[in-house]
Amino acid sequence: MVDFKLSPSQLEARRHAQAFANTVLTKASAEYSTQKDQLSRFQATRPFYREAVRHGLIKAQVPIPLGGTMESLVHESIILEELFAVEPATSITIVATALGLMPVILCDSPSLQEKFLKPFISGEGEPLASLMHSEPNGTANWLQKGGPGLQTTARKVGNEWVISGEKLWPSNSGGWDYKGADLACVVCRVSDDPSKPQDPNVDPATQIAVLLVTRETIANNKKDAYQILGEPELAGHITTSGPHTRFTEFHVPHENLLCTPGLKAQGLVETAFAMSAALVGAMAIGTARAAFEEALVFAKSDTRGGSKHIIEHQSVADKLIDCKIRLETSRLLVWKAVTTLEDEALEWKVKLEMAMQTKIYTTDVAVECVIDAMKAVGMKSYAKDMSFPRLLNEVMCYPLFDGGNIGLRRRQMQRVMALEDYEPWAATYGSSKVDKSRL
């Protein structure tokens, strides 16, 4: 029998996240909303991130066997929904740190894990991590044979790797002071000559390397080897930092190479982004849930000049019903996806497809949910004294970031479906090929 009842530890994780969101995160807006630019708003959230560390929310991004407190990805999804239902500021910085740690968590080097995860399980300070993958010219087709590939390159020189190139959008990558994150996993294309284009006859996946860069690494380089060129001003998520960064002959010790370059490194990156894809669904649910809850309260307390609360009008109720159904189905899909990702009996392609369809569905319908909540409320929802304008700007980002639904996530799912041995129901029933004879 399928059981959706939360375990005691999952209920406790939800309670803890709710308490933090309601007592700490609710105060964040008053601090960052007066700031005039993206970086200043990001920096204004630093005390709240420090509180997140102190409350164990960063340690909760690391699995228990590696010194953290994360029991499962289901626990993580529950936590994220509660945080994003209240305030994305700091919450998105926590998520970005989790993504930044993911390649290290997934690697098979206990020594690297012990060394680089240590600051994040200490419960002290404000350590930031970042997965530096995205580039100014886009990375949706970074593994397409015959394409230019990643423009951030790395070449081996003696006992070091030398990085050259630019990154744009990786959250947390500049750190609090633009002197770098405490840990950045920089995804590069191996090339002996950065000025030469990628060989069109070579599989790009075989040329990938991940190098671990710390603030100490940056400090040990020449000043112009690491530069922040700018910070995008965003319509929503106005407290996140994902600056435009340039590496110029930037030296990294060979011991900071995460794993053997090539398919193994590419696999770590793909797995990290598959896990984050499912968890973005929880973030989207939190934001859409906030819109639904505000619209529901409004509909049950306001008449809009009539004789009864607007919830009594069928058109309003229908919009709220649609929102509720989308939220419930999205949550179940997220829970199924993260459970599938942790099921060792399933093939990777099955896990990947489940994560992709979760990211696509949940983030797309979250946008619809916020818009329908606004329609239920009416013109009042467009006023800034309500949460809807902010929620709309935030929810619009989810289908676009962490691998855009159109350019990347649907294409990943398409490739899985096109496989000759594709089994559409493997994540639910195990191996179960479609009987073509009856079709």
From Swiss-Prot:
Catalytic activity: a primary nitroalkane + O2 + H2O = an aldehyde + nitrite + H2O2 + H(+); a secondary nitroalkane + O2 + H2O = a ketone + nitrite + H2O2 + H(+)
pH dependence: Optimum pH is 8.0.
Coiled coil: none
Regulation: Strongly inhibited by mercury chloride and KCN.
GO MF term (any one): oxidoreductase activity, acting on the CH-CH group of donors
Binding positions for FAD per the UniProt entry: 131-134, 139-141, 169-171, 304, 313-314, 375-379, 400-404
Main enzyme class: oxidoreductase
EC numbers, comma separated: 1.7.3.1
Upregulation: Up-regulated by nitroethane.
Record keywords: FAD, Flavoprotein, Nucleotide-binding, Oxidoreductase
GO biological process: butyrate catabolic process; detoxification; fatty acid beta-oxidation using acyl-CoA dehydrogenase
Effect of residue 409 to K: Reduces catalytic activity
Cofactor annotation: FAD
UniProt-listed Pfam families: Acyl-CoA_dh_1, Acyl-CoA_dh_N
Temperature-activity profile: Optimum temperature is 40 degrees Celsius.
Effect of residue 402 to E: Decreases enzyme activity about twentyfold
Active site: 402 (proton acceptor)
Nucleotide-binding recorded as keyword: yes
Gene3D superfamilies documented for this protein: Acyl-CoA dehydrogenase/oxidase, N-terminal domain (1.10.540.10), Butyryl-CoA Dehydrogenase, subunit A, domain 2 (2.40.110.10), Butyryl-CoA Dehydrogenase, subunit A, domain 3 (1.20.140.10)
InterPro entries the record matches: Acyl-CoA_Oxase/DH_mid-dom_sf (IPR046373), AcylCo_DH-like_C (IPR036250), AcylCo_DH/oxidase_C (IPR009075), AcylCoA_DH/ox_N (IPR013786), AcylCoA_DH/ox_N_sf (IPR037069), AcylCoA_DH/oxidase_NM_dom_sf (IPR009100)
Subunit and partners: Homotetramer.
Record function comment: Catalyzes the oxidative denitrification of neutral nitroalkanes, including 3-nitro-2-pentanol, 1-nitropropane, 2-nitropropane, nitroethane and nitrocyclohexane, and may thereby protect the organism against toxic compounds. Has no detectable acyl-CoA dehydrogenase activity.
Similarity comment text for this entry: Belongs to the acyl-CoA dehydrogenase family.
Name of protein: Nitroalkane oxidase
